[in-house]
Amino acid sequence: EISCSLVGSEMCIRDRVSAGAQLILAECAARGCNFHDLADYAAIQINDTHPSMVIPELIRLLGQRGIEFEEAVEIVTKTCAYTNHTILAEALEKWPRAYLDAVVPQLMPIIEKLDALARTRTEDESLAIIDKDDRVHMAHMDIHFTHSTNGVAALHTEILKNSELHGFYELYPEKFNNKTNGITFRRWLLECDPLLTATLEKHIGSGFRKDAAELEKLLASVSYTHLTLP
């Protein structure tokens, strides 16, 4: 079971993380982009902590292209952003150092250097990437080495700032922001279907553009035959 888990994790990192990072750099090179300005050409969104290994992997790949560690960290920080969807444990992964040593031995030295760099910014042990029990905190790495940390609802973001990630918020207040999750009709209706938008405006006015509750006025036209295209 352990070996299968190791193989599965290694394949995940190779196929999803490393291949993705390599594709980004390959496309960047094909377009004549300067790797030193990667953030001007690419944006990597880390959704929860499952893709967190893209941070050390991208640093490793940039190092192979002759970029020094300190600059690679700066480039990756500008390129990557982190979204936290929930404070539940499955979204705040922690992996034993020994496990990562077995799965990604080439990345552990980079993670250790990132941990050392993070410790120069704060003496708070609870914000370290590698804790006293030799566990690697993926969310901690994400917050330290991305330029943005967002929650997905106003209340959720306030909980992150004032409770669950309060120490990080005190250290990096400028990084924290909210991006409400979900689908907005303003995109799939107003932007994507102007003909339907015009039809609705003909029958119920334009108030629904700012107030979705105005769409309830359509209930007066449920016969379908009453609605006509503009």
What are these regions (language model features)?
Residues 9-227:
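A conserved ligand/cofactor-binding region detector
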Residues 1-8, 226-230:
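Single conserved hydrophobic/aromatic residue that forms the stacking wall/gate
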